[in-house]
């Protein structure tokens, strides 16, 4: 055992003197490797008688543990010293300019959505949302659209083969009007909301896509009349297009969910081959352009939402967000909105730092 003690003392001294991980590894192999002196000492236990083995085994195991602990402690110290040396050489110069990164851009639809929300928030409207997969009761029946209404046809609406727990057919919503029904049933009256979002119809050409964006507005209160509707739309369009010469023309129309119903035209002129909203459509060089549909909410729709139409009245309107973006920012093909062409996005996208505010003007700055 005297030889084992001497070997241990020599090994501990060599371990403490190791100045690198490689040198430390050599000491580990010399002591604890398959042919190391500790391993060889352990192998001698097999040739000892039981009494001798009972005394020698704990002593050898104690030496083995002491050497292993010394190696582990020295390894931690060497790794810590190496890390400190590395950190001392790797300094960060905070005066250096940051590397230039390419910023993404805000899609025109997202930009216009933000502009709409900013304007209507100033008018006291809240933003309401709802599911894009709807049942036919919320999408059609509750909006006074009969079973025979053309909009329910398969060639206009994307239906799912499934039905809900009440047997209602499921579909991709064709407008955001179901949000109005859900909001009235959940919140009651009075209510003042806009409902922006994606809608789906089976149509595709330069001005129509199977999926597009729509915003609808709803006001339910006492003593509401058509004059309130016209003022709201005029105020909104003046703020959105940032022009005071917005002139509207209301034409009688028909929508099953409003009565009376009106189509809203806006005066415009052509400048550089594009339509520019503003001015009287009857003036020289101007014309009228249909912009949106609106009207006073039908009594049956108010009843469907669980409200008393003798106490509560209201108006609603709906228009395409994509079309608004095209008119304001000069795009000419709706399909390009969804192509994902990076060149188009680079040209028409907006800075993420350009947040629309009424104080600075909601339009994106070039």
From Swiss-Prot:
The keyword Manganese does not apply. Binds 2 magnesium ions per tetramer. It is an enzyme of class 6 (ligase). It holds the Pfam family Phe_tRNA-synt_N. It catalyses: tRNA(Phe) + L-phenylalanine + ATP = L-phenylalanyl-tRNA(Phe) + AMP + diphosphate + H(+). It comes from the Bacteria. Keywords: Aminoacyl-tRNA synthetase, ATP-binding, Cytoplasm, Ligase, Magnesium, Metal-binding, Nucleotide-binding, Protein biosynthesis. Gene3D superfamilies: Bira Bifunctional Protein, Domain 2. It is found in: Cytoplasm. GO terms for cellular component: cytoplasm. Its main location: cytoplasm. Tetramer of two alpha and two beta subunits. This is Phenylalanine--tRNA ligase alpha subunit. It comes from Erythrobacter litoralis (strain HTCC2594). The lineage of its organism: Bacteria, Pseudomonadati, Pseudomonadota, Alphaproteobacteria, Sphingomonadales.
């Amino acid at each position: 055992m005297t030889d084992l003690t001497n070997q241990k003392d020599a090994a501990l001294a060599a371990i403490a003197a190791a100045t690198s991980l490689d040198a430390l590894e050599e000491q580990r192999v010399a002591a604890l490797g398959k042919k190391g002196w500790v391993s060889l000492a352990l192998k001698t236990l097999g040739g000892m008688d039981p009494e001798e083995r009972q005394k020698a085994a704990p002593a050898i195991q104690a030496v083995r543990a002491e050497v292993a602990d010394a190696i582990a402690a020295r390894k931690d110290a060497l790794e810590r010293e190496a890390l400190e040396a590395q950190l001392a050489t790797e300094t960060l110069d905070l005066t250096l300019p940051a590397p230039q990164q390419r910023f993404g851009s805000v899609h025109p639809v997202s930009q216009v959505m933000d502009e709409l929300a900013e304007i209507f928030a100033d008018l006291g409207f809240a933003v309401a949302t709802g599911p894009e997969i709807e049942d036919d009761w919320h999408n059609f029946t509750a909006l006074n659209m009969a079973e025979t209404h053309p909009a329910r046809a398969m060639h206009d609406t994307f239906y799912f083969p499934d039905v809900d727990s009440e047997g209602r057919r499921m579909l991709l919503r064709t407008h955001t009007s179901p949000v109005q029904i859900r909001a009235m049933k959940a919140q009651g009256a009075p209510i003042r909301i806009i409902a922006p979002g994606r809608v789906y119809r089976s149509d595709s050409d330069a001005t129509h896509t199977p999926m597009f964006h729509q915003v609808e507005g709803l006001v339910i209160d006492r003593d509401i009349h058509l004059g309130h509707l016209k003022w709201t739309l005029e105020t909104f369009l003046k703020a959105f297009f940032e022009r005071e010469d917005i002139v509207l023309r209301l034409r009688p129309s028909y929508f099953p969910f409003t009565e009376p119903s009106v189509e809203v035209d806006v005066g415009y002129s052509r400048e550089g081959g594009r339509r520019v909203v503003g001015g009287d459509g009857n003036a020289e060089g101007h014309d009228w352009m249909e912009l949106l549909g609106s009207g006073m909410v039908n009594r049956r729709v108010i009843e469907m939402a669980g409200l008393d139409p003798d106490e509560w009245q209201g108006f609603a309107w709906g228009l395409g967000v994509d079309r608004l973006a095209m008119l304001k920012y000069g795009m000419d093909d709706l399909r390009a909105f969804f192509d994902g062409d990076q060149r188009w996005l680079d040209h028409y996208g907006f800075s993420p730092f350009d947040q629309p505010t009424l104080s600075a003007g909601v339009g994106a700055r070039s």
